[in-house]
Swiss-Prot record:
Keyword terms, alphabetized: Aminoacyl-tRNA synthetase, ATP-binding, Cytoplasm, Ligase, Nucleotide-binding, Protein biosynthesis
Gene3D superfamilies named in the record: Bira Bifunctional Protein, Domain 2, GAD-like domain, Nucleic acid-binding proteins
Region Aspartate, annotated ranges: 199-202
Protein name as annotated: Aspartate--tRNA(Asp/Asn) ligase
Record has Cytoplasm as a keyword: yes
NCBIfam families to which the protein is assigned, alphabetical: aspS_bact, PRK00476.1
Pfam families assigned to the protein according to its UniProt record, in alphabetical order: GAD, tRNA-synt_2, tRNA_anti-codon
Biological processes per GO annotation: aspartyl-tRNA aminoacylation
PROSITE patterns assigned to the protein according to its UniProt record, in alphabetical order: AA_TRNA_LIGASE_II (PS50862)
Cellular compartment(s): Cytoplasm
InterPro entries (alphabetical): Aa-tRNA-synt_II, aa-tRNA-synth_II, aa-tRNA-synth_II/BPL/LPL, Asp-tRNA-ligase_1, Asp-tRNA-ligase_1_N, Asp/Asn-tRNA-synth_IIb, GAD-like_sf, GAD_dom
Catalytic activity as recorded in UniProt: tRNA(Asx) + L-aspartate + ATP = L-aspartyl-tRNA(Asx) + AMP + diphosphate
Length: 591
C-alpha cells in the first residue's frame, strides 16, 4: 500500500465496503457524539467521513486533532445505515472506521476558518491566502480557471493555431498604461520593462511567416485597481493571424469563446447572435462601450421635443453647439416613488438629477403624462416622446442633457440601475456584442491629440484618412463585450511603415522616437509584412464571469490587494543596499 494513501477522499463507495484503506488529508471538522468521533477528512478531490469509537486503536489520538491538521488514516470501509447516507457527498454511502492515525502536519490556531463560507476581511484572507484557498468556493474557482485554460488551449489547437512563447522582459513601449521597469545590472542607467502585452512580438511572429499564433500570456501593467481588473498583472489569451480582415478574426474567435461559455456556463443560455455595434451607437444607446445587452433598455436622442419648449433648462441648453437631450426609457417604472429614487441615484453619481415623465391612468380613465417635465412641455410634446420611445401606461422615461461626453457615463450607469431595479435585466444568460469603429484618436486632459486605443491599429481609410481631422478617423479596432464587461480587445494592424509614422506623428511622436521605441517592428515591416490582425481575451475576467463573481481577486490564485500589495509575500519590499549598489541606484526620498 502507498505510504500516504490507497485512495483519494472522493473515490470510495459501496463497492469498497470491507476493504482496508489508507487516506491522507486535512481535518475538515470533528464532531464528538458521546464517545464516538466523526471526522471529515478532506483532500483536493473531496471529503470522506472517518469514525472512531472507544474500541478503535486510533480513538485516543484522534481526540487530539484539530481543524486543518494534516493526518493519515488507516481503516476499514463500512457501509452507512440507509438513514445516514449523505447524497451531497460522492462518498456519502460509506465511512471509514479508523484503526490507525498519524499526524503529518499539525496546525496552529486558525486566523480564519476553512469550514463554512463565513465572510472575513480581505486583508486577513490575502495574508493567509493558502488557508483561504482551502475553502470550497475558492477551490472551485481555481479549478474552474485551470479547466478554462486547458479548454482554451485545446480549442485553439483544434482551430489550427500554434502556441509560441514571447519574452517576459523587453523594452518599454507606450501601450496605454505605465510600465513596470526593471533596472539592468550589466547596463547601468538602462532599464528593461515587463511587457504590457506581447503586442510587438506577436506581430513580428506574423512577419516571420507563421500564420496563426496564440499564447496564454502574462501581462504587466502598473494600473489603478478596479473590481474587474488586477493592478499589476493578468493573463490573456493572445491571438494573431495573417492575411485576415476584421470579420475573419471574428469568425475564428466566436467558436472558441462561445464553446467555452457553453462548456463552463453552468447551463446558462449562450446567445449565438453576436451583433456588430459601432462605438458611437454603443455610447448613444447604452452609455458604455461594453454594454450589457441582457438589459433591453435603449437610450434615444429626443432633442427635437425640447427645443423651444417650456422647459427652459433644456431649451436653453440646446442653443449651445454639440448639446443634446437623451431619454432613458423605463418600462413598468411609472410611479413617482420610483422616479424620485432614480433621480436621487443620478445625484449620487455627481449630476444635478434627471428629469422624468411617467404615464398613468387619469381621473377620467384615459392615459395621462405626469411629472415635472410633463407640466413644462405640454401634452403634445409628451405624447410625441411617448410614441418615439414606444412606451405606454405604467411606464416612465428619464432625461439627461448637455454635451454627451459630460453625461454618457452616468446615463449608462442609470440605465443599468433602472434595468436592475425593474427586473428587466435577463438572468442566466450570456449576451455578446462586437463593438467596432472605435475612434483612432481622442483629446487627452491637456487637449492634445492622443491614441484612444491600441496605437498599432490600421486607420480606416489608410493614409488618406490621416490627412484630415484626426478626431474623425476610425480605426480597425474592436472589443467584445459580454454582460457589461469587456472580454476581448483587438484590431487589424498597421503593417505599413509610412502609415505608422503618420499615425504616430498625429499623436505627437516624431519619426525618430517611433524608430527608437519600435525599431524592431519598423525594421521588420520594411522586409515584407503581411496584412495581419488579432485580439486578446482577458482570462481573469472570463473566469470571473463564469464563476459569477463580482471581484476579480476571487478567481486569481495569489492576487494583490487594492493598493497593489502582496500581503502574503510582503511585496513590494525595500531592496538591500547591496542590491542598490549592484544596480547603481539610490532611493530618492519623497518630498
Amino acid at each position: 500500500m502507498h505510504a500516504y494513501r490507497s485512495h483519494t477522499c472522493t473515490e470510495l463507495n459501496a463497492a469498497h465496503v470491507g476493504q482496508e484503506v489508507r487516506l491522507s488529508g486535512w481535518v475538515h471538522r470533528v464532531r464528538d457524539h458521546g464517545g464516538v468521533l466523526f471526522l471529515d477528512l478532506r483532500d483536493h478531490y473531496g471529503i470522506t467521513q472517518v469514525i472512531a469509537d472507544a474500541d478503535s486503536p486510533a480513538f485516543a489520538e484522534l481526540e487530539t486533532v484539530r481543524a486543518e491538521w494534516v493526518i493519515r488514516i488507516e481503516g476499514r470501509v463500512k457501509a452507512r445505515d440507509a438513514s445516514l447516507v449523505n447524497p451531497k457527498l460522492a462518498t456519502g454511502e460509506i465511512e471509514v472506521y479508523a484503526t490507525g492515525m498519524s499526524v503529518l502536519g499539525a496546525a496552529d490556531e486558525l486566523p480564519l476558518p476553512v469550514f463554512g463560507e463565513t465572510d472575513y476581511p480581505e486583508e486577513t484572507r490575502l495574508t493567509y491566502r493558502f488557508l483561504d484557498l482551502r475553502r470550497e468556493k475558492l477551490h472551485q474557482n481555481m479549478m474552474l480557471r485551470s479547466n478554462v485554460v486547458r479548454s482554451l488551449r485545446n480549442r485553439m489547437w483544434g482551430a489550427g493555431f500554434n502556441e509560441f512563447q514571447t519574452p517576459i522582459i523587453t523594452a518599454s513601449s507606450p501601450e496605454g498604461a505605465r510600465d513596470f521597469l526593471v533596472p539592468s545590472r550589466l547596463h547601468p542607467g538602462k532599464f528593461y520593462a515587463l511587457p504590457q502585452a506581447p503586442q510587438q512580438f506577436k506581430q513580428l511572429i506574423m512577419v516571420a511567416g507563421f500564420d496563426r499564433y496564440f499564447q496564454i500570456a502574462p501581462c504587466f501593467r502598473d494600473e489603478d485597481p478596479r473590481a474587474d481588473r488586477s493592478p499589476t498583472d493578468f493573463y490573456q489569451l493572445d491571438i494573431e493571424m495573417s492575411f485576415v480582415e476584421q470579420e475573419d478574426v471574428f469568425a475564428a474567435v466566436q467558436p472558441v469563446i462561445q464553446g467555452l461559455f457553453e462548456e463552463f456556463g453552468h447551463g446558462k443560455r449562450v446567445d449565438a447572435d453576436w451583433p456588430r455595434i459601432a462605438y458611437r451607437d454603443a455610447m448613444l444607446w447604452y452609455g458604455s462601450d461594453k454594454p450589457d445587452l441582457r438589459n433591453p433598455i435603449k437610450m434615444q436622442v429626443v432633442s427635437e421635443h425640447f427645443a423651444g419648449s417650456g422647459f427652459a433648462i433644456f431649451a436653453k441648453l440646446l442653443e449651445n453647439e454639440g448639446t443634446e437631450i437623451r431619454a432613458i426609457p423605463a418600462p413598468t417604472g411609472g410611479s413617482r416613488k420610483f422616479c424620485d429614487r432614480m433621480n436621487a441615484f443620478a445625484q449620487s453619481q455627481g449630476l444635478p438629477g434627471m428629469g422624468y415623465i411617467f404615464w398613468r391612468k387619469g381621473d377620467d380613465g384615459a392615459m395621462e403624462a405626469a411629472g415635472p417635465l410633463a407640466k413644462n412641455i405640454g401634452p403634445e410634446r409628451t405624447e410625441a416622446i411617448r410614441q418615439q420611445l414606444g412606451l405606454g401606461e405604467g411606464d416612465a422615461a428619464f432625461f439627461l442633457g448637455g454635451k454627451p461626453e459630460t453625461f454618457e457615463a452616468v446615463a449608462g450607469r442609470a440605465r443599468t440601475e433602472i434595468g436592475r431595479e425593474l427586473g428587466l435585466t435577463e438572468e442566466n444568460c450570456f449576451k455578446f456584442a462586437w463593438i467596432v469603429d472605435f475612434p483612432m484618436y481622442e483629446k487627452d486632459d491637456e487637449g492634445k491629440i492622443d491614441f484612444s486605443h491600441n496605437p498599432f491599429s490600421m486607420p480606416q481609410g489608410g493614409m488618406e484618412a490621416l490627412e484630415g481631422d484626426p478626431l474623425k478617423v476610425h480605426a480597425y479596432q474592436y472589443d467584445l463585450a459580454c454582460n457589461g464587461y469587456e472580454l476581448i480587445s483587438g484590431g487589424i494592424r498597421n503593417h505599413k511603415p509610412e502609415i505608422m509614422f503618420k499615425a504616430f506623428e498625429l499623436a505627437g511622436y516624431p519619426k525618430e522616437e517611433v524608430e527608437k521605441r519600435f525599431g524592431g517592428m519598423v525594421k521588420a515591416f520594411r522586409y515584407g509584412a503581411p496584412p495581419h490582425g488579432g485580439c486578446a481575451a482577458g482570462i481573469d475576467r472570463i473566469v470571473m464571469l463564469l464563476a459569477d463573481e463580482a471581484n476579480i481577486r476571487e478567481v486569481i490564485m495569489f492576487p494583490m490587494n487594492q493598493r497593489a500589495e502582496d500581503l502574503l509575500m510582503g511585496a513590494p519590499s525595500e531592496p538591500t543596499n547591496e542590491q542598490l549598489r549592484e544596480l547603481r541606484l539610490r532611493v530618492v526620498p519623497k518630498d
